[in-house]
Swiss-Prot record:
Role according to the record: Catalyzes the specific phosphorylation of the 3-hydroxyl group of shikimic acid using ATP as a cosubstrate.
Example GO molecular function: shikimate kinase activity
Record carries keyword Kinase: yes
Residue sites binding Mg(2+) per the record: 18
Key words, A-Z: Amino-acid biosynthesis, Aromatic amino acid biosynthesis, ATP-binding, Cytoplasm, Kinase, Magnesium, Metal-binding, Nucleotide-binding, Transferase
Record protein name field: Shikimate kinase
Provenance organism: Histophilus somni (strain 2336)
Length: 175
């Protein structure tokens, strides 16, 4: 990769965006930023608390402001929250300001990867988390596909291998 163009990772919770993003940034010598971590740092509170106090709408407003700001930086690998693409503005920011990689995974893999994670507000205090994941996938998967320059399944490979695959795919795109 000759120039350090922004790389934006989108996909559902549990797809591996943060893990793969860290690997990718390390290999490329780029800055890694996780939007959820950035939101928590700026708010001085975790995402579950923000959801409890401000609701999902309040959280999404914070997320949109941060994505608008961060996507204007140069040479970053940005891991977005699973619902970031619901916002048309976010989809526009991501598409216009970098290469968007959709890290695709199955609902079953998502469920396995998130079932013990207490930092997933949309999966807390629900009767059937798997059904929630299926419902989210129906709404969000077409939006991930819409915004993606590259779609990459993440179910069976290591983060380092996935990061190297992304580099190869971006090089082949000649973006």
């Amino acid at each position: 990769m000759a120039e350090k163009r922004n790389i934006f990772l989108v996909g559902p919770m549990g797809a591996g965006k943060s893990t793969i993003g860290r690997q990718l940034a390390q290999i490329l010598g780029m800055e890694f930023i996780d939007t959820d971590a950035e939101i928590e740092q700026r708010a001085g509170a975790d995402i579950s608390w923000i959801f409890d106090v401000e609701g999902e709408e309040g959280f999404r407003k914070r997320e949109e402001r941060i994505i608008n700001e961060l996507t204007q930086k140069q040479g970053i690998v940005l891991s977005t929250g699973g619902g970031a693409i619901v916002s048309k503005d976010n989809r526009n920011y991501l598409s216009a300001r970098g290469t968007v990689i959709y890290l695709e995974t199955t609902v079953e893999k998502q469920f396995q990867r998130t079932q013990r994670d207490k930092k997933r507000p949309l999966l807390q205090n629900v009767e059937d988390p798997r059904q929630v994941l299926e419902d989210l996938a129906k709404v969000r998967n077409p939006l991930y596909e819409e915004v993606a320059d590259i779609i990459l399944p993440t179910d069976e490979q290591s983060a380092k291998l996935m990061a190297n695959q992304i580099i190869d795919l971006i090089d082949n795109l000649k973006i």
